[in-house]
Each structure stands twice: as C-alpha cells, then as structure tokens.
Regions:
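Active-site neighborhood of phospho(di)ester-bond hydrolases with catalytic His/Asp-centered motifs
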Residues: 1, 19-26, 54-58, 71, ...
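Core catalytic region of metal-dependent phosphoesterases/phosphodiesterases
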Residues: 1-59, 116, 120
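Active-site-proximal segments of metal-dependent phosphoesterases and phosphodiesterases across multiple
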Residues: 4, 75-121, 128, 132
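Active-site environment of divalent metal-dependent phosphoester hydrolases
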Residues: 21-34, 61, 76-78, 97-101, ...
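Beta-strand-turn-beta hairpins that frame and shape the catalytic cleft
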Residues: 60-70, 84-90, 137-142, 170-171
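Binuclear metal-dependent phosphoesterase catalytic core
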Residues: 61, 143-203
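Short beta->alpha connector loops
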Residues: 71-77, 148, 193
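Conserved beta-sheet core of the metallophosphoesterase superfamily
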Residues: 103-169
Length: 204
C-alpha cells in the first residue's frame, strides 16, 4: 500500500510540472509470465490523468516535436521501426548496456549492444544504478540516468538524482539529490582507527 501511495504521489506531482512519460521497468512485471497484469497499469488507469502517459509496448510515439522511440521489456527490447521525420527522436530504454559498469566495478559483458539505438538522436536509459554516458550510432549521446538516490552499500553516496534534457539547446544536465540517510562504507586498519577518528570513507 505504501508503494502505491508513493507512485501515485510522484506521478501526480510530476504531471503538475509537465507531461509525464514513463515506460515499464524490470521490477514492474513478471517477465516469465506476461499474462499477469503489470504493476503500473492499474495505477495509471485509475488516475485517469491525461498528463501521465504510459508507453508499455515498443513503438515510436509522436508527441508534438518529439518522437518517443520506446524499447519495451515486454517485447524484449526489440528495436522499433524508426521512420524519417523532422522530430527529435528520443529513445526510452530499460536494461543493461554492454560496457557499462556498476559502482563496485562490475562490467556488463552480456548486456544489450548500442547498435539497436541507430536512428535515435538521444537515448535515456534506466536499470544500472550508476550514472554514466555512452555513445550510440551516429556519434549521438545516450545517458544511463542511474538511481534517484543511493539504494544500498554497493552504490556511491553522491552522483544520484535526475537528468534534464534541453531539446532546443541539445544539452543534458544532471541534478543531484542529497540522501539524508546514506549507506556509508568505511575502511579501517584497526579498531584504533575508529577510536581516533581515522576511518576512511570509501564510497563517496
């Protein structure tokens, strides 16, 4: 119940600022049983808010001067057919990308390759909790946005928040959010380090 309240609150508040577009993530449904209803559909359907747009399936969705190029996990992140247009083509993707890393240094070798993003002007990605930038075909940029706040001891304290893409200027900026209750990892050589205040924070 608390999670439903939170999702309703955050989507409603975001929709007061601007039209809010979202896609499905790996925690929102059972990939092994697609006959089950996903977690987001009932919430969004009940809100009946025209400014909350849920693109569950893969496809290209025209939204004024933007073409949302949606890669859906429901459809195994297949590349949708991208037609030529004057609109800015922004890919929306959720999944691991080959070559990207986590905060503890794990490198994804078996993730999705970047060739599937050919035709996009920009791609916004979710899944890996570490914020990072990578290149897609056409020398365009893609952004793994990362987690909104630090989730556990395996993540850095800083470099979490959200990103803003300025369509007219073709610029992307990140906004950091401060976690009031961070997970802190300290390194010590002995108990004396704690007693003397010489412990070293290692996951800033």
């Amino acid at each position: 119940p608390e999670l439903i309240n939170f999702v309703v609150w955050i989507l409603t508040e975001c929709s007061k600022i601007c039209k809010t577009v979202l896609i499905i993530g790996n925690h929102d449904f059972l990939e092994s049983n697609l006959s089950r209803v996903d977690a987001l559909s009932p919430i969004i359907d009940s809100l009946k808010n025209p400014d909350i747009i849920y693109y569950k399936d893969s496809g290209v969705y025209v939204d004024e001067n933007i073409d949302w190029v949606v890669y859906s996990l429901v459809n195994h992140n297949v590349r949708p057919e991208i037609d030529k247009s004057d609109n800015v083509k922004i890919g929306l993707f959720h999944g691991p990308i080959q070559g990207l890393t986590t905060d503890i240094g794990y490198k994804f070798e078996d993730g999705f390759d970047t060739d599937r993003f050919k035709g996009c002007d920009l791609v916004l990605c979710g899944d890996i909790h570490k914020r990072q930038t990578f290149t897609i075909p056409g020398k365009k940029k893609a952004y793994m946005i990362g987690s909104t706040i630090q989730q556990n001891f395996g993540e850095s304290v800083k470099n979490h928040g959200y990103g803003i893409y300025h369509v007219n200027d073709d610029k992307y900026e990140t906004i950091d959010l401060i976690n009031p209750r961070p997970f802190l990892n300290f390194k010590i050589k002995s108990i004396e380090d704690l007693e003397k205040g010489n412990e070293r924070l290692v996951n800033v």
